[in-house]
Amino acid sequence: MTTTPNTPLPNSLQKPLERFYEFLRSEKGLSLHTQRNYKQQLETMAQHLAEMGLKDWSQVDAGWVRQLAGKGMREGMKASSLATRLSSLRSFFDFLILRGEMSANPAKGVSAPRKKRPLPKNLDVDEVNQLLEVNEDDPLAIRDRAMMELMYGAGLRLAELVSVDVRDVQLRSGELRVIGKGDKERKVPFSGMATEWVGKWLRVRGDLAAPGEPALFVSKLGTRISHRSVQKRMAEWGQKQSVASHISPHKLRHSFATHMLESSNNLRAVQELLGHENISTTQIYTHLDFQHLAQAYDQAHPRARKKNGE
């Protein structure tokens, strides 16, 4: 059966859609914009069903849903649009299950690919050195330098930096206890410069910290510093130190990852340091250029080296 978008759908496909649209209007309270999106996506999918010769929604299985998602990807559909398509389909099938017209939701296990977020450009080593040339005696300046040294020296997330307590820091061994995503604990080493400046900060921290405050880094009020304050202070130091790039905590972490991977070519070690559960996250996060990839290959692959100087 061949149809066009203007071909009327059989009642067995159209009537359930109309009942669902009424359900969205009267009971779900969705906005008109969302209702229009759902209707557009479901009408398109109904046309696909008709083109395949299917006459009832109960004939849809997970394979068809995956095929539909794959078709959208091949046609260049945005991840957000594909997510809307699958979401509308899941909601519709849940509605049919509620009415006893289907026994299972074939769209339940199918998900849209995650929308790729552009990674920030990392700082080069000279920019990092320029940023960290902070040599002021003011306790807040010492704190800020210690924060930046620790973030770049250990590759911390912003939330991890803020959550560090004094008891988590082992200056003698240069080791830090970190609570990462999902409350997963890891221990990471940190640089000699971070050790030096965290030590300096600990010597003046008592001038600011409220009695009994466990946080390593505190605000002028004496309590744990906020995420926003860290972001603001780092951006200000970037301007004060005349660094061309905008400075953010994530950019320092990204720079740590990139510089570590460029110098070591050890993806697994960098994964552990960053606290990534999957190594694929590390591969995306630390964008090696082809030169570094080729260098890593030449050094590691047993058949990459030429024999007898050839």
From Swiss-Prot:
GO molecular function of the protein, one example? DNA binding
InterPro entries linked: CB, DNA_brk_join_enz, Integrase-like_cat_sf, Integrase_catalytic, Integrase_recombinase_N, Integrase_SAM-like_N, Recomb_XerC, Tyrosine_recombinase_XerC/XerD
Q: Does the keyword Lipoprotein feature in the UniProt annotation?
A: no
Active-site residues, as the UniProt record annotates them = R157, K181, H250, R253, H276, Y285 (o-(3'-phospho-dna)-tyrosine intermediate)
Using the record, list the residue span of the signal peptide; answer none if the entry has no such feature: none
Primary subcellular site in the record, as a coarse category: cytoplasm
Domain of life per record: Bacteria
Q: Which UniProt keywords apply?
A: Cell cycle, Cell division, Chromosome partition, Cytoplasm, DNA integration, DNA recombination, DNA-binding
Q: Name one GO biological process term.
A: DNA transposition
Does Cell division count among this protein's keywords? yes
Annotated Tyr recombinase domain ranges read 118-298
**Gene Ontology, cellular component aspect:** cytoplasm
- Tell where it localizes: Cytoplasm
Domain Core-binding (CB) spans what residues?
11-97
The entry's family comment says: Belongs to the 'phage' integrase family. XerC subfamily.
> Main role?
Site-specific tyrosine recombinase, which acts by catalyzing the cutting and rejoining of the recombining DNA molecules. The XerC-XerD complex is essential to convert dimers of the bacterial chromosome into monomers to permit their segregation at cell division. It also contributes to the segregational stability of plasmids.
Subunit notes for this chain?
A: Forms a cyclic heterotetrameric complex composed of two molecules of XerC and two molecules of XerD.
Q: What is this protein called?
A: Tyrosine recombinase XerC
